[in-house]
A protein has these predicted regions:
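Nuclease-adjacent, charged terminal/linker segments that flank catalytic cores
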Residues: 1-48
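Acidic active-site catalytic centers that drive phospho-/nucleotidyl reactions
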Residues: 128, 141, 154
Length: 169
């Protein structure tokens, strides 16, 4: 075991326990459920230049898509394929949440300014795939139309939430 990643292991193991706040991931469609989902939140951020890279992960994802019999099955096919065939993939569908407390930490301790400080409920989501490559944690989210929906806010929330849950500096 690599001591550097014990916090990831602990977080993933905690997910199946009673200690994990499963209730915050139950969305009530009638009560503004979209307000608490990371995938639905948009906010102002620095201009980000998109750099597209091709790597082994891209190649594996293309192979995985061949296993899907329909568009609906693509997401699950990629996750299953990566978990089985990619040694850097350590988990799929990892539930993650960012609380007002977390947002306050980023504002007061790190000087971040973003419009999530007074959100009514925890902002939640599920990281499609989590990988550890070259000593770094990678968060992957399958978006077939990423160019249209621009998921940077969602991935930023996931990274910030994961950083708080793992006490990363």
């Amino acid at each position: 075991e690599n001591p550097q990643f014990l916090d990831i292991k602990s977080y993933i193991e905690k997910i199946s326990s009673k200690q994990f706040p499963h209730h915050i991931f139950t969305y009530n469609r009638n009560n503004n459920a979209n307000e608490q989902r990371a995938s639905q939140i948009k906010f102002e951020h620095l201009k980000i230049d998109h750099i597209q890279k091709q790597n082994r992960g891209n190649e594996l994802a293309k192979l995985a898509l061949n296993l899907a019999k329909s568009n609906k099955e693509r997401h699950q096919a990629i996750q299953d394929f990566m978990l089985i065939n990619d040694s850097t993939t350590i988990a799929a569908e990892v539930p993650i949440y960012l609380t007002n407390w977390d947002a306050g930490y980023y504002r007061n301790q790190k000087g971040f300014i973003f419009p999530l400080n007074n959100h009514q409920t925890p902002i939640t989501g599920h990281i499609d795939l989590m990988q550890v490559r070259n000593g770094l944690i990678h968060i992957l989210d399958y978006k077939p139309e990423a160019d249209k929906i621009k998921p940077i806010e969602q991935l930023t929330i996931y990274a910030m939430a994961l950083s708080r849950k793992l006490n990363l500096q």
